[in-house]
């Protein structure tokens, strides 16, 4: 029996050429091998593999349960990706010509470029940070044919947030940021307490609802029936709170600025609630990001900064964002937005919260190093690759816009997402491998890796070329483009494997996959050098880059944690996380050590970050697990 799939004639011709040119290995890397396209073969392979990540053509550490739901979701991915590539090729050909379409398909197939979430790339956007203002004022306004009304109490509002997260998560492929969740939860909580609706302990009431929300977003079938909802919650120091919410009002018309102290206290309650829950039930979401103003050598809101750093000592579960201006903001596990550059900054507060990305397409920087004769050749090739990447992203954006016009993405019609507030994102990976290939790294007598001065300068030139090329490209466009150092959950291994096939004598294979840090976590170096390099290149990544600073154990003292955080901020590193290994028993209690203090059971798995948020190592792919075993961990308590 033959099943007809109608594809563009030109695309079919080029697709067949790619299969012939690159062979079975690359077909499998792309998810287009016979066994991946065959549903029966896929089912057999899925059953035999240890984890979903090893069976998927586009794995995610957030998908941990291997069951019928994940089987049914993963099975058609190759076909969805094939249809998406057909659409992109067709539209690229129309807008930029036949040669450009062919160049893209070759670059994507050979893994010079990597389009993330490719199977949904023409169907839904990547990520967005949503304001909950309308939800707080009107209720479930996004549900069609539903007579909605506003929440009157905290419990109802939390239920509304759960529905909101489920709705938005299923209409995007990436994160759902909730930067103003805390002020609105505080509003409903304080009204319930002050009105006498809730007459028992107010703290208990708050913590119960915080727990309800955390358990809901970690329910493993909220998104696409196979994974929990990738959510991020923001916490701010006083200068940020004033800047972002100073011009905003609660649903009853009361200015948020009048409740600044209450909002600050509720932030602390939420963070403490998250911390307590981890001991009982280790979880992944929401990702917590704490933003501080650090200026002239000190934290402006030192009281909150000290409280937050002390709080973070237990689990190191918050990502820390420092800036000398409120025009920069973190909305995601690594997403960093320069609000002024992106045109979304409002001095009276509020509008800066709604920002996101349409799609991410990554440039394999290591590949260019293997192709190049020297630095100048590298930079010329890089410029061409960036231009091609920008054309692809522009085309995908056009397709998403058409989907909106056809009413296929109601989250845009509802006003939840504004396409004008989303940028296209150039992903990068392979900075370390590029420097190693050029001979721009060195070892000290203790085996620590350092970047040479040539690496520092070459890195600057690489980022300058990327930035100048994208700025030139968008001169006649009505949107912005950002640069992001990607997590590379799935991409890092596939790109390295492709380069190993094509450049077996040149490929840098210090680790089983390419690093998602400027110095990968499996490469031995000093904490100071890791911070120095991240500080040097961090500012170029206006779409996100987070430095992971691996600790073999939590800080012993607040003074150590405080001094280290101040040092990092003083070096100009804006976004970072102290990363630990959190053990979990079979009952999912979080702890440090070999035996669970709650139930006495031994370690069943460990939680740590790939990028941005903690996930159980047992759900990772084989290559990721190998990389985890090779990671270096700093002893900060010696």
Say what each PLM segment does:
Residues 2-420, 441, 447-452, 456-597, ...:
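Conserved catalytic cores of very large enzyme subunits
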Residues 183, 424-437, 609:
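Contiguous, well-ordered alpha-helical segments that form the cores/surfaces of helical PPI scaffolds
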Residues 204-207, 211, 215, 437, ...:
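Metallocofactor- and cofactor-centric catalytic cores in central/energy metabolism, strongly enriched
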Residues 247, 403, 438, 445, ...:
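Short amphipathic alpha-helical leader/targeting segments
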Residues 419-420, 424-428, 617, 625:
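Core of folded catalytic or high-affinity ligand/protein-binding domains
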Residues 427-430, 543, 612, 623:
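Glycine-centered flexibility sites
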Residues 581-638:
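Intrinsic, low-complexity terminal and presequence regions
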């Amino acid at each position: 029996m033959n099943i007809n799939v109608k594809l563009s004639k030109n695309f079919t011709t080029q697709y067949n050429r790619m299969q012939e040119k690159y062979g079975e290995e690359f077909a499998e890397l792309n998810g287009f091998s016979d066994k991946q396209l065959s549903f029966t073969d896929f089912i057999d392979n899925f059953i035999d593999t240890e984890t979903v990540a090893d069976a998927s053509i586009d794995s995610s550490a957030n998908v941990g349960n291997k069951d019928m739901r994940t089987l049914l979701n993963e099975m058609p991915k190759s076909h969805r990706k094939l249809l998406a590539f057909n659409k992109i090729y067709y539209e690229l050909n129309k807008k930029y010509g036949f040669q450009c379409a062919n160049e893209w398909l070759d670059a994507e197939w050979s893994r010079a470029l990597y389009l993330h979430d490719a199977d949904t790339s023409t169907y839904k956007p990547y990520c967005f940070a949503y304001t909950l203002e309308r939800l707080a004022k009107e209720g479930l306004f996004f549900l069609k044919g539903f007579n909605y009304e506003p929440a009157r109490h905290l419990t109802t509002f939390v239920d509304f947030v759960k529905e909101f997260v489920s709705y938005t998560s299923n209409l995007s492929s990436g994160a759902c940021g909730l930067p103003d969740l805390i002020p609105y939860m505080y509003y409903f909580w304080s009204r319930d307490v002050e009105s006498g609706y809730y007459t028992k302990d107010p703290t208990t009431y708050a913590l119960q609802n915080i727990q309800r929300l955390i358990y809901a977003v970690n329910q493993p079938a909220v998104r696409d029936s196979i994974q929990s909802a990738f959510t991020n919650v923001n916490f701010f120091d006083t200068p940020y709170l004033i800047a972002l919410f100073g011009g905003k009002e609660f649903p009853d018309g009361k200015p948020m600025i009048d409740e600044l102290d209450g909002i600050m206290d509720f932030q602390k309650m939420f963070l403490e609630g998250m911390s307590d829950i981890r001991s009982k039930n280790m979880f992944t979401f929401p990702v917590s990001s704490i933003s501080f103003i650090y200026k002239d050598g000190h934290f402006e809101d030192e009281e909150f900064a000290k409280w937050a750093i002390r709080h973070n000592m237990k689990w190191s579960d918050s990502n820390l964002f420092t800036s000398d201006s409120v025009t920069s903001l973190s909305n995601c596990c690594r997403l960093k937005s320069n609000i002024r550059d992106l045109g979304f900054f409002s001095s009276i507060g509020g509008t800066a919260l709604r920002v996101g990305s349409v799609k991410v397409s990554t440039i394999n920087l290591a590949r260019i190093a293997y192709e190049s004769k020297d630095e100048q050749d590298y930079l010329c090739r890089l410029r061409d690759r960036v231009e091609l990447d920008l054309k692809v992203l522009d085309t995908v954006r056009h397709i998403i816009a058409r989907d909106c016009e056809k009413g296929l993405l109601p989250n845009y019609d509802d006003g939840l997402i504004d396409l004008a507030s989303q940028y296209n994102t150039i992903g990068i990976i392979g900075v370390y491998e590029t420097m190693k290939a050029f001979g721009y790294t060195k070892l000290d007598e203790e085996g620590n890796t350092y970047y040479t001065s040539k690496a520092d300068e070459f890195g600057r030139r690489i980022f300058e070329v990327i930035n100048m090329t994208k700025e030139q490209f968008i001169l006649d466009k009505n949107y912005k483009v950002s640069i992001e150092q990607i997590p590379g959950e799935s991409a890092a291994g596939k790109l390295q494997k492709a380069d190993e096939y094509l450049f077996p004598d040149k490929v840098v294979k210090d680790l089983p996959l390419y690093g998602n840090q400027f110095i990968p976590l499996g490469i031995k170096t000093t904490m100071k050098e890791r911070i120095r390099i991240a500080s040097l290149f961090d500012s170029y990544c206006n779409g996100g880059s987070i430095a992971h600073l691996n600790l073999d154990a939590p800080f012993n003292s607040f003074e150590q944690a405080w001094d280290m955080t101040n040092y990092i901020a003083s070096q100009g590193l804006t976004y970072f996380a102290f990363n630990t290994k959190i053990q979990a028993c079979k009952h999912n209690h979080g702890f440090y050590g070999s035996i669970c203090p709650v139930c006495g059971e031994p370690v069943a798995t460990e939680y740590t970050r790939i990028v941005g948020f903690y996930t159980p190592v047992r759900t990772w792919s084989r290559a990721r697990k190998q990389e985890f075993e090779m990671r270096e961990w700093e002893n900060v308590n010696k």
